[in-house]
From Swiss-Prot:
The cathelin-like domain (CLD), which is the propeptide part, does not seem to exhibit auto-inhibitory function, as it does not inhibit the antibacterial activity of antibacterial peptide LL-37. GO terms for cellular component: extracellular space; vesicle. Residues 1-30 form the signal peptide. One of its GO terms (molecular function) is lipopolysaccharide binding. Residues 31-131 form a propeptide. It is found in: Secreted; Vesicle. This is Cathelicidin antimicrobial peptide. PANTHER family: CATHELICIDIN (PTHR10206), CATHELICIDIN ANTIMICROBIAL PEPTIDE (PTHR10206:SF2). Disulfide bonds join 86-97, 108-125. Proteolytically cleaved by proteinase PRTN3 into antibacterial peptide LL-37. Proteolytically cleaved by cathepsin CTSG and neutrophil elastase ELANE. After secretion onto the skin surface, the CAMP gene product is processed by a serine protease-dependent mechanism into multiple novel antimicrobial peptides distinct from and shorter than cathelicidin LL-37. These peptides show enhanced antimicrobial action, acquiring the ability to kill skin pathogens such as S.aureus, E.coli and C.albicans. These peptides have lost the ability to stimulate CXCL8/IL8 release from keratinocytes. The peptides act synergistically, killing bacteria at lower concentrations when present together, and maintain activity at increased salt condition.
Amino acid sequence: MKTQMDGHSLGRWSLVLLLLGLVMPLAIVAQVLSYKEAVLHAIDGINQRSSDANLYRILDLDPSLTMDGDPDTPKPVSFTVKETVCPRRTQQSPEDCDFKKDGLVKRCVGTVTLNQARGSFDISCDKDNRRFALLGDFFRKAREKIGEEFKRIVQRIKDFLRNLVPRTES
């Protein structure tokens, strides 16, 4: 009788171990981050280490170069962040913050790992000095000035046309 109970007990433990063996790989797979999620975690770390007053939010994410199957292998990343209106000490997620007008733009490069449990990143960010970023500011300011000048010209034409209309004497 005792042998039968030991057999049932052994069978139960075998079943439990089998189920754990099936579930554990699923738990490990569930802990692998996507490329974008890993970058967002890195941006959270950048915001925590930053001495700037406001949070940064992702502006542009370059496509991933290589995605091998090992989540522990560092993956090269490059992305651009921009300053938001949210103070760094806030508990708000940067993704919920609006970009600050004329906020600082930084270009970031480095590596991230996709393993959520042991995730790590090595990222450095510098002020974005790429020419097209400067050109974007130039064209935006030029468009604003042209718009203001156009409004003044239209107003002058209206004033001129009003002066051409014969006036009736009162």
